[in-house]
Amino acid sequence: MQSLKPFHTFAVPAQAKNIVEITALEQLQQVWDGCRQENQPVLFLGQGSNVLFLKDFAGTVLINRLMGIEHNEDEQFHYLHVNSGENWHNLVEWSLSQSIGGLENLALIPGCAGSAPVQNIGAYGVEFKDVCDYVDVLDLNQGKQFRLTNAECEFGYRESVFKHKYAQGFIVTAVGLKLAKAWQPVLKYGTLANFDKSAVGFQQIFDEVCAVRRAKLPDPKEFGNAGSFFKNPVISAGHFALLQQEYPNIPNFPQDDGSVKLAAGWLIDQCQLKGYQIGGAAVHQNQALVLVNKGDATASDIVELAHHVRQSVAAKFDVYLSPEVRFIGELGEVNAEQAIS
């Protein structure tokens, strides 16, 4: 067995039968075929920034190290072809160094490019789907590559076809990004709303997003964590109207379909849970949406804490939080919401 601690940011004690770093598609196919012959479970990991290992993993963990960025352009757009092992934040920095705007709101989101479409990552009013042109996928059982258009990815809030139809036996090998040369800032959220739309540049937005995220979010090197642990819940307009009567200042984001998205961090904060600790796991002092490993947390500490947070928010607001983090059991991914219910 090999330790998974260096390969995931929650840094809980967990091991895998084998760990293989993948640098080429041929190698990936070879290792996959070998695991299939031995009936061994396989797990793909990028930066390990959005997973919690509940138990030791009984099979082989493949670490994505497929690197490389290609840049093309026409009169209207920049086109980036990014291999899936590239670090997402490094990609954002690289694009700005090439004077390409459009990714600055997504700065400092942990993980690699291949995870971006799976989660449809998003922050500060921009989601991956807004910049995605296509996603390249390898069907490991057939040994064939294919390309999905943006529409075929079926993106939703922290949601995509890669969590369903293409969850097993498929891997994202590259993403295609399409970024308009006629850059428009997105200043809807938080302190970005203070900028003058006609005067701001993408570097300023990048710097502000980084400053805010660094102030709020703990460094995984100091306290193990997986960023935002819970998704922001979406509720009906009727439910929201009732909550707003009792909590007039409740942060809310109306959705196109009439539903209303709430800020999970605010809901947790109202339950006075910042700093609340179970075993070695705690709700972070500065950002209630983040659960941290204080150094000696076990997976069960984190699950128990997540359960307590979920129950507390449900009791106060009748809103049930769902984890954004993926839970990995002995044989692969398990239902995270069930695990903390």
UniProtKB/Swiss-Prot annotation:
Coiled coil: none annotated. Pathway: Cell wall biogenesis; peptidoglycan biosynthesis. The keyword Cytoplasm applies. The active site is at residues 158, 228, 324. Gene3D superfamilies: 3.30.465.10, UDP-N-acetylenolpyruvoylglucosamine reductase, C-terminal domain, Uridine Diphospho-n-acetylenolpyruvylglucosamine Reductase, domain 2. NCBIfam families: murB, PRK00046.1. This is UDP-N-acetylenolpyruvoylglucosamine reductase.
